[in-house]
Amino acid sequence: PEPDIRYHFKRLTMEGSAHYMKETYGLEQSIEEICTGVMSGIEFAYRDCIQCKPSVVDMLEALSNAGVAMCVATATRRDCALAALERLDILKYFSALFTCTEVGASKTEPDIFELALSHLGTPRETTFVFEDSLHAIETAHAAAFPVMIIDEPASASDAEACQALADVRLKNFTAFSTL
């Protein structure tokens, strides 16, 4: 794969990513077949593999005990996100789950963050967006949301740009307890 392939996938919809793969790599499969193949891998990962990062549950428990309202705003399909949240027993910490598909816009637009804010009923200036992808951090920052980032190996290529936009940066979830 090309070295910047993750950059393209982070910013594109599933269909857009399939078009990119088809054109870039000359794939013979239809866009629908490519999407189906990619989704089966994603479904497996969310249903069976993805684990919480160390100290995530402790952080969620502390926030919940402090009465902090939380919801999920994700680019992931609802069924995949729910499968992981339920399997990891952390769905209970969130009052709602919003997906880009259901909102009708990717995280290059602030729609999902605005919907989450409306649901939570909290002031924008105290409603932190936790993000790990540069395009979503840029969107949340431009929409005047405070942004918290946790250093992520998957986002290492964008680390400097993410840090420049973040209001709070933590090296890991364990560091949250020091705030």
Spans of features found by a protein language model:
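Crotonase-fold acyl-CoA enzyme core
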Residues: 71
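N-terminal helical cap/lid subdomain that shapes the substrate entry/recognition surface
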Residues: 1-57, 62-66
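Short, flexible loop segments at the rims of nucleotide/cofactor-binding pockets, characterized by
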Residues: 46-51, 75, 147-149
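Functionally critical, cavity-lining and gating residues within the transmembrane helices
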Residues: 14, 74, 78
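Asp-based, Mg2+/Mn2+-dependent phosphohydrolase catalytic module
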Residues: 57, 61-64, 68, 77-179
